[in-house]
Amino acid sequence: MSRDLTAVQAKAATLVEALPWLATFHGRTVVIKYGGHAMIDPGLAASFAADVVFLRYAGLRPVVVHGGGPQIDAMLRRLGIEPVFAAGLRVTTPETMDVVRMVLVGQVQREVVGLLNAHGPFAVGVSGEDGRLFTAVRRSAVVDGHDVDLGLVGEITEVNPTVIQSLLDDGHVPVVSSIAGGVDSDGRRCVYNVNADTAAAALAVALGAEKLVVLTDVEGLFADWPNTDEVISRLTADELEKLLPGLAAGMIPKMEACLRAVRGGVAAAHVLDGRVPHAILLEIFTDEGVGTMVVP
């Protein structure tokens, strides 16, 4: 009895297409910022975990940096605390910081580690405080010409990647929560809430990563925002810098992270639609790719 081999041959063609990329990226580090809809949709979360484990089996060294804004908001409201934002950043009182720390390290990180470890004993959770991975100083913001006190919101000033390097060398997949240690205005040690996009970019630079991948809830960087007909597939750091002032507010920190990464030595930064199943594999291992790639 004859068989229709079309579907099987298509799978083989996909594998062959991936071959040069597998050779190019074998042994290279890829930092992935995980957030958005891909984090809260069970099917997309499972797809994300499969992609990361595939990278590990394919010989790459993936690192996951996660946020958790929706989960933090939900917990704050359960505790009777209304989330407050200024200049696109969470105003973080000491009480809010306790919730941020609890949710990121105790809830979201555990969920991501569990998803990955369903495929094997790979993932290890790490807080930005561990091994002094991230050190930050208090960040300020200006709204309508006035300084705004953001509380315990930090800007990363130093990255010590030793603990991450050790985990990678041992074959693990680090899962990093975006908080940082530091000192307050009185010189006392404290913990800061840091933007996960910024944290991922800083870590990618410190690790000498080949790629930074940022998952979003849009298709990529649009050529003529707010028109969404055309996505820019590739642009240089200089081209991106010129576009930054006109971007949607939610895209600015993500594209700034890409800019910092490539100017810090990362070979390429990618903004992908996390709502697309297996977007990471499509971007890294196919000729067409998806999303937007930023190069130096």
UniProtKB/Swiss-Prot annotation:
Keywords: Amino-acid biosynthesis, Arginine biosynthesis, ATP-binding, Cytoplasm, Kinase, Nucleotide-binding, Transferase. Gene3D superfamilies: Acetylglutamate kinase-like. It is found in: Cytoplasm. Substrate binds at G68, G69, R90, N193. CDD domains: AAK_NAGK-C. GO terms for molecular function: acetylglutamate kinase activity; ATP binding. The keyword Oxidoreductase does not apply. Pathway: Amino-acid biosynthesis; L-arginine biosynthesis; N(2)-acetyl-L-ornithine from L-glutamate: step 2/4. The record marks K33, K254 as: Transition state stabilizer. It comes from the Bacteria. One of its GO terms (biological process) is L-arginine biosynthetic process. GO terms for cellular component: cytoplasm. InterPro entries: AceGlu_kinase-like_sf, AcgluKinase_fam, ArgB, Asp/Glu/Uridylate_kinase, Glu/AcGlu_kinase, NAGK-C. It catalyses: N-acetyl-L-glutamate + ATP = N-acetyl-L-glutamyl 5-phosphate + ADP. Catalyzes the ATP-dependent phosphorylation of N-acetyl-L-glutamate. Belongs to the acetylglutamate kinase family. ArgB subfamily. This is Acetylglutamate kinase. It comes from Acidothermus cellulolyticus (strain ATCC 43068 / DSM 8971 / 11B). The gene is argB.
